[in-house]
Amino acid sequence: MMPLPPQVPRRGGRISRRVAAALLRLLGWHVAGSVPDVAKCVVVAVPHTSNFDGLYVLPALLALDLKMSIFGKKSLFAVPGLAAFLRWAGVMPLDRARAGGVVDEAVAAFHRSKQLFLGISPEGTRHAAPKWKSGYWRIARGAGVPVLPVAIDYGRREVRFLPLFTPTADMAADHAALAALFRGIEPKHKHRLSWPLREAQMAETD
C-alpha cells in the first residue's frame, strides 16, 4: 500500500489498516494513483450508483490510513456511545437548522482545521442524477482548497486517486472539466450513471 505524504491527515490505526488491506485484497480490489501532498481538500468520489460503493471506498481509505471526514446529522451525536464512534469514523456534526447550511458549515470547518479531507457527493443520489449539485464547488471556492477526484472503477476493480482539480470562477465549465476526468470509469450500474458523467463518456466516443 502506498505511503501517505506528510501533509495528509491520518487515522493512526495500525490494526484497522492491516484488517482493511486484507479485506480489500479479499474483495479483489486495489488502490491506484497517488494521494497528493496537501493538508486540505474537498474529496469527490464518483460514480456513485450503488450502496456497494462504500464497501470498497471505506477499506481503501482505512488501508491507506487516510482520514476523510463527512457530515452527519448533529442529533446522532446525542445518542449514548455513538458520538465517539462517529468522530473516529470522521463524521462531523451538521446542524441543518443553522443559517447558511452545509456550505457555510464546511467552509468554517476548513478555516478552523489544520488538516481536512472532506468528502462531498456532487451527484447527491445513486439514481442517474440529471446534474451535479454545486455544494462541492462552492465549498472548495469558499475555503480556497482544491478538489481531489476519486474514481470508483468496477471495470478495473480499483479506487483510483486522480490529479487535483483547482476550481475556477466558472462553475459550469468546472463541472464539465471535472466529469471529463472520469472518462472510461465503469460504474456498478451503468443505467444509474449521472448525466454529466454520461456526457463525458459520450464525448470520448465521438
Q: Which residues does each predicted region cover?
A:
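Soluble catalytic domains of membrane acyltransferases
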Residues: 4-9, 25-184, 197-202
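Helix-enriched interaction subdomains in cytosolic or periplasmic regions
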Residues: 1-17
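C-terminal domain-closing interface element
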Residues: 190-206
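S-adenosyl-L-methionine
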Residues: 187
